[in-house]
Design a protein with these regions (language model features):
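Small-residue-biased structural context
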Residues: 1-204
Length: 204
């Protein structure tokens, strides 16, 4: 599931930058669409990282895993939060005043954010995911992992819709291996109304 989430993050960051660079001068409607989709990405990524900070890193610390690695993960999360905030501010400026100059500045801010985000995701996939794979059958790990889920069924449905939007077959297969396909289909079609209404049209 972690790599499915990471793929969705990478995808949204990339297409946000592309959308900003292609934004016609003065197109406020499109700028607000981009801002809405970016806000969804920030919301999903914030939930993902707060869940890791509150659950995974303390769990691994108690198990005696490398404290320097865990400190690096937390530090990278702080850097990502700052980069996301800077990009959000720049995108808000475009939504308020959709000039080519503001769009270019926002695209550059998203590009800078992308470098921070991708460096962290690569680091986590390289050094933390192998640990997680080793612990898949650990009962305490399984109990902790339940705390990573979204707070409500609606939040879960919107997250699933986001993960699938633009996903390749590899990500979709991985998702179906974790959650039964019919469950994913029902939640995405009938419960994920916010995502389908507010975000999905941005990327069509």
């Amino acid at each position: 599931m972690n790599q499915v989430i990471h793929a969705a993050v990478r995808r949204d960051v990339a297409r946000t930058e592309q959308a900003l660079r292609a934004l016609p001068d003065g197109d406020g409607s499109r700028a607000r669409q981009i801002q809405s989709a970016w806000g969804n990405l920030v919301r999903e990524l914030t939930h993902h990282h707060e869940a890791e900070d509150e659950n995974i890193w303390p769990f691994l610390q108690e198990r005696g895993y490398d404290p320097d690695l865990l400190a690096a993960m937390e530090s990278e999360h702080v850097a990502m939060k700052q980069a996301l905030a800077s990009a959000s501010t720049a995108i808000a400026a475009v939504a308020t005043s959709p000039t080519s100059a503001h769009a270019a500045a926002a695209a550059n801010a998203v590009s800078a954010c992308s470098a921070v985000v991708n460096a962290h995701l690569d680091h986590e996939e390289r050094d933390v995911e192998p640990i997680a794979l080793q612990m898949e059958d650990d009962p305490e790990w399984k109990a902790m992992a339940k705390k990573l889920r979204p707070a409500s069924i609606v939040d879960a449905a919107n997250a699933l819709a986001w993960m699938q939007d633009g996903a390749g077959e590899r990500e979709r297969s991985s998702l179906r291996a974790t959650i039964p396909g019919p469950v994913v289909a029902i939640l995405t079609r009938f419960v994920a109304r916010r995502y389908r209404r507010e975000v999905a049209p941005v990327w069509r």
